[in-house]
Curated annotation (Swiss-Prot):
The active site is at H141. The keyword Transcription applies. InterPro entries: HDAC_PDAC, His_deacetylse, His_deacetylse_1, His_deacetylse_dom, His_deacetylse_dom_sf, Ureohydrolase_dom_sf. The keyword Nucleus applies. The gene is HDAC1. It is found in: Nucleus. GO terms for molecular function: DNA-binding transcription factor binding; E-box binding; histone deacetylase activity; histone deacetylase activity, hydrolytic mechanism; histone deacetylase binding; histone decrotonylase activity; Krueppel-associated box domain binding; metal ion binding. It is an enzyme of class 3 (hydrolase). This is Histone deacetylase 1. 1D-myo-inositol 1,4,5,6-tetrakisphosphate binds at G27, K31, R270.
């Protein structure tokens, strides 16, 4: 596949001003506020002038149950901090309560995250954009009927299902430090989605993503896992990422790509143990973009929030083929970026435990697996189902789409200033990075496998039954 450097491409960006108001709770490392910080920084860099900015619709239960089970979504809709005691059994069943707490507005937060990713996929399908960006998405650990690793609804799976209506083969790439287990599991038995994950492996959450996990049934060899050790740096990462992705592109020949840009793989992340700089991380974005495929860019992990905002702002600029200065512009959160107030970060002096021999050995094993694939699976033509997001449908949503949570009314969702600081004691609480092997599920039940095979069929049937969906996303005013 030919590479073309520096081609200007149309970019659509999804953001809702309310997303930063949601709050996982005292001491929890996941802070949706980082998305507001990112948005504010890229506004002050003037990047909004170069792309179309949309406010996503709130994904409804019908959209979510294209993948998730009905009872799980019903539970997420119903549970609140004030009625938790009535749901203790279900909380256990759906893995909600510790790493994935119940917080005020939980379901709305999931609706915004999923809404942005699904709307992005529809935009790409309609060829109304070349690149779509949703930094509130990328929640790759959520399972069909279970929350996991701070993720409740798997917006990535929902977006890929949408892309599959128009694209025979979709490639998913994950550069978060944690294995993209939820996405891999959803597409483990299909040859229409290839999942490629580069992640820390061994005594680390979620405990999956072994080199030998390659997919099953029709999906055998369509799951690609690159297990890594602590301390990988820019040079080593680039030396594995580029050849693996080139080989995947050549062999799988996708017509659309989804890139999960989890920024917990950066140096100095509160939960991470890699040593990438923002430039090193963004080289992955640049390389994937160079294949000139319809591309969906999503967020994900990232727990040193000043660096998350830096990273995703820079990667938005990369998507736009725009150079931005290292000197940060003044913005609403300027004090977070001290003492240097610069965009780029330096690597630490941590040891890179990934030797060249180790990386080469893994790479060769992956290449052997990729050689087992038939070149570009055959295309099966089917009627195209309806889009999930209907633009100008004429039907109003039950809720006024312009109704917003005012900052004043949502004070209880926002923590005190110290909560958002990146202080030294941040290692306490939050997701346990030591793998819980009891929960690290690899073997699927026969029932799940059957469900997976019926997914395309079910997808088509549901689409025919669908009523008109909520009105299309609206362009956001630039003043947000």
């Amino acid at each position: 596949m030919a590479l073309t450097q520096g081609t200007k491409r149309k970019v659509c960006y999804y953001y809702d001003g309310d997303v930063g108001n949601y709050y996982y709770g005292q001491g929890h490392p996941m802070k949706p506020h980082r998305i507001r910080m990112t948005h504010n920084l890229l506004l002050n860099y003037g990047l909004y002038r170069k792309m179309e900015i949309y406010r996503p619709h709130k994904a409804n239960a019908e959209e979510m149950t294209k993948y998730h089970s009905d009872d799980y979504i019903k539970f997420l809709r119903s549970i609140r901090p004030d009625n938790m005691s009535e749901y203790s059994k279900q909380m256990q069943r759906f893995n909600v309560g510790e790493d994935c707490p119940v917080f005020d507005g939980l379901f709305e937060f999931c609706q915004l995250s999923a809404g942005g990713s699904v709307a992005s996929a529809v935009k790409l399908n309609k060829q109304q954009t070349d690149i779509a960006v949703n930094w509130a998405g990328g929640l790759h650990h959520a399972k069909k009927s279970e929350a996991s690793g701070f993720c409740y609804v798997n917006d990535i799976v929902l977006a890929i299902l949408e892309l599959l209506k128009y694209h025979q083969r979709v490639l998913y790439i994950d550069i978060d430090i944690h294995h993209g287990d939820g996405v891999e599991e959803a597409f483990y038995t299909t040859d229409r989605v290839m999942t490629v994950s580069f992640h820390k492996y061994g005594e680390y959450f979620p405990g999956t993503g072994d080199l030998r996990d390659i997919g099953a049934g029709k999906g055998k060899y369509y799951a690609v896992n690159y297990p890594l050790r602590d301390g990988i740096d820019d040079e080593s990462y680039e030396a594995i990422f580029k050849p693996v992705i080139s080989k995947v592109m050549e062999t799988f020949q996708p017509s659309a790509v989804v890139l999960q840009c989890g920024s917990d793989s950066l140096s100095g992340d509160r939960l991470g143990c890699f040593n990438l700089t923002i430039k090193g991380h963004a080289k992955c974005v640049e390389f994937v973009k160079s294949f000139n495929l319809p591309m969906l860019m999503l967020g994900g992990g990232g727990y040193t929030i000043r660096n998350v905002a830096r990273c995703w702002t820079y990667e938005t600029a990369v998507a736009l083929d725009t150079e931005i200065p290292n000197e940060l512009p003044y913005n609403d959160y300027f004090e977070y970026f001290g003492p240097d107030f610069k965009l780029h970060i330096s690597p630490s002096n941590m040891t890179n435990q990934n030797t060249n021999e180790y990386l080469e050995k893994i790479k060769q094993r992956l290449f052997e697996n990729l050689r087992m694939l038939p070149h570009a699976p055959g295309v099966q033509m089917q009627p195209i189902p309806e889009d999930a997001v209907q633009e100008d449908s004429g039907d109003e949503e039950e809720e006024d789409p312009e109704k917003r949570i005012s900052i004043r009314n949502s004070d209880k969702r926002i923590s005190c200033d110290e909560e958002f600081s990146d202080s030294e004691d941040e290692g306490e609480g939050g997701r346990k990075n030591v793998a819980n092997f009891k929960k690290a599920k690899r073997v699927k039940t026969e029932e799940e496998k059957e469900e997976e095979e019926k997914k395309d069929e079910k997808e088509e049937e549901k689409a025919k039954e669908e009523k008109a969906e909520p009105k299309g996303v609206k362009e956001e005013t630039k003043s947000t």
